[in-house]
């Protein structure tokens, strides 16, 4: 019977945050949870060995943390500690498998791959049949109130009072004013200018560059398609049918195409609003390099920050802008975080997202190819406080019930118990 769960911290901040959110629920379910610190491997390794009980322990991780032959869990000639103690390894891959082709090898015997998008799951099962595909588990959200209860965020009231003191305002009225949403539109996420990708497009020769540009142009013209759908069609047309082991390497070498189209549409969404005179607060790196901005005074720059601070900023926003990172049958945590913290999420749709949240249930959908409609949709939301609040209310009821990290932990705990019983 599984009673103990190992998780990872000290790597990518957002992944550590997701892990701690899930750990809260795992502990509520009766599991003992140990966090292995990737920044303190020497001290963590000894504690990890004391924590492990063979056949009672599993690893739950994101993005192959703890599965990259880290010194504390892997030794040359011996292998992974996970294999030594017969530990199942559940890895939630927070992006497409083609980003991880170089990591999808030499993995522990009991590796279990979890996909956050149903089409990504299908791709993994076709191109990596040597590994177990455990299922589809989309990303989830956290409400700031939940973070407050867990001691991870300053209470809303305290933030409001602090702001009132800093600005010289006193009393309940000043605090209430500061607590009201102060960002009309916000986007939390980084931006990379498109010229950054030119060396990758041109890295072989002109013939390959033309091939890559054809794929990019096809994706920009047909944004409902996945990168693999378009890229594989072009590969077959140019080179004929190739074995999957060759194609998966080819797709891995084209990940810059995925990043190009993500940033193209993310930049276009922000630019469209800013050029329409709508102020947009962007939280993350790279936005000072956004091209073709006609109203720079409407582009409000904020530095990249941690997860809890982002949640606080969402709680202070009316509208949260999202462009899906090419998840065509999954969801991004930005969508759920926005709704849980009181902002309407204006986003492009995905098949899964439209099943879970209908129009007006926390979200307003704008197809990428209909970007010209974005300013009017956002203006309508900003001008209708009661309507906007009703959209959030309807969405929050659904998200609180189905799309928190606690719910994801419960699903994963059921899978772990099911696997252990076999």
Regions found by a protein language model. Give the residues of each.
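Short, hydrophobic beta-strand segments that form beta-sheet elements in well-ordered domains
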Residues: 35-37, 90-92, 112-116, 136-137, ...
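A short, gly/pro- and small-residue-rich
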Residues: 73-90, 200-213, 334-343
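Catalytic binding pocket for nucleotide-activated donors in carbohydrate/polymer assembly enzymes
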Residues: 7-11, 17-29, 34-41, 106-108, ...
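Residue-identity detector for glycine
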Residues: 151, 162, 168-174
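A structural micro-motif
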Residues: 3, 31, 57, 87, ...
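Nucleotide-sugar donor-binding catalytic core of glycosyltransferases
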Residues: 2, 9-18, 128-157, 174-328, ...
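Extended catalytic core of nucleotide-activated donor transferases of GT-like folds
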Residues: 4-8, 15-126, 143-148, 152, ...
